[in-house]
From Swiss-Prot:
Protein encoded by which gene: CCDC12
Assigned keywords, A-Z: Acetylation, Coiled coil, Isopeptide bond, Phosphoprotein, Ubl conjugation
Lineage start: Eukaryota, Metazoa, Chordata, Craniata, Vertebrata
In-chain residues carrying the UniProt-annotated modification N6-acetyllysine: K53
Modified residues (N-acetylmethionine): M1
Protein name as catalogued: Coiled-coil domain-containing protein 12
Coiled coil: 8-28, 117-144
Length: 166
């Protein structure tokens, strides 16, 4: 029994030491000592209630009849004009006109010989023109040759008719 009472006495002493250390810390930090033993939340509630007594009333759904209440009434809030802000936001949201269309050929990966093709393309244009001219000349020559043979065939046919009619 004596061991348990000694253990309890020792625990009480340690508790007292802790309380003294806590008191010293409170004094150091400037907090008030709890004399009442009431919880801190109770003190805060009492302070809030005192503050609420002097708050202005927001009577939205009913008109007070008491003069004291009419004096403490908060004026109705006026809606804020937001038209200008909305216009600015709409203007900012408008996309800027695209000046140049994006060419998909520029975005796609290119073949390794694309630069050679680009350099040769100019020369090929000149050659295409020459080729077209040469083809046109050949066609004209054939037509002239056919006209001559056609004319001789017509002459031969007319000669045969004249011979046959004789």
């Amino acid at each position: 029994m004596e061991a348990t009472t000694a253990g309890v006495g020792r625990l009480e002493e340690e508790a007292l030491r802790r309380k003294e250390r806590l008191k010293a810390l409170r004094e150091k930090t400037g907090r008030k000592d709890k004399e009442d033993g009431e919880p801190k939340t109770k003190h805060l509630r009492e302070e809030e209630e005192e503050g609420e007594k002097h708050r202005e009333l927001r009577l939205r759904n009913y008109v007070p009849e008491d003069e004291d209440l009419k004096k403490r009434r908060v004026p109705q809030a006026k809606p804020v004009a937001v038209e200008e802000k909305v216009k600015e936001q709409l203007e900012a949201a408008k996309p800027e006109p695209v000046i140049e269309e994006v060419d998909l050929a520029n975005l796609a990966p290119r073949k390794p010989d694309w630069d050679l093709k680009r350099d040769v393309a100019k020369k090929l244009e000149k050659l295409k023109k020459r080729t077209q001219r040469a083809i046109a000349e050949l066609i004209r020559e054939r037509l002239k040759g056919q006209e001559d043979s056609l004319a001789s065939a017509v002459d031969a046919a007319t000669e045969q008719k004249t011979c046959d009619s004789d």
